[in-house]
């Protein structure tokens, strides 16, 4: 499980890579780009896991965000946090470690769902097989 640690404003703590869809991008392209930008990891999408929403206030206005989550396989164990965005650390963790490190409950739930999908694929000997797109 790939996580990164942020120290910007109130978001101190470990989180999953995510970001905003840029014009002309699909959700899949955004997910891959954000993983690369935020952690410098190269990955490929295995399966769509689900969608979550969260909200916060900015200048007394509520902002609601939707995040589409994907189970991915990294090419290796390299990661480097994106310092320009105030990320101070990144790394790969076992499920139980990642679960306890994550700050936000909705990300813990998505992590559980992704882990269940991973276990299903692993039990069928389908994890780690490079699929053609």
Regions of interest found by a model, annotated:
Residues 100-133:
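Charged phosphate-binding loop/patch that engages nucleotide di/tri-phosphates or the phosphate backbone
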């Amino acid at each position: 499980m790939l996580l990164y640690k942020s120290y910007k404003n109130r978001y101190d703590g470990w989180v999953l890579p995510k970001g905003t869809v840029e014009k002309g991008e699909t959700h899949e392209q955004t997910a891959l780009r954000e993983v690369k930008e935020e952690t410098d990891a190269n990955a490929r999408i295995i399966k769509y896991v689900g969608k979550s929403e969260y909200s916060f206030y900015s200048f007394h206005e509520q902002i609601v965000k939707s995040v589409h989550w994907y189970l991915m396989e990294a090419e290796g164990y390299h990661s480097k946090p994106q310092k320009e965005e105030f990320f101070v650390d990144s790394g790969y963790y076992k499920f139980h470690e990642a679960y306890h490190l994550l700050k936000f409950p909705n990300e813990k739930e998505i992590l559980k769902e992704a882990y269940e999908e991973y276990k299903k694929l692993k039990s069928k000997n389908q994890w780690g097989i490079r699929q053609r797109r």
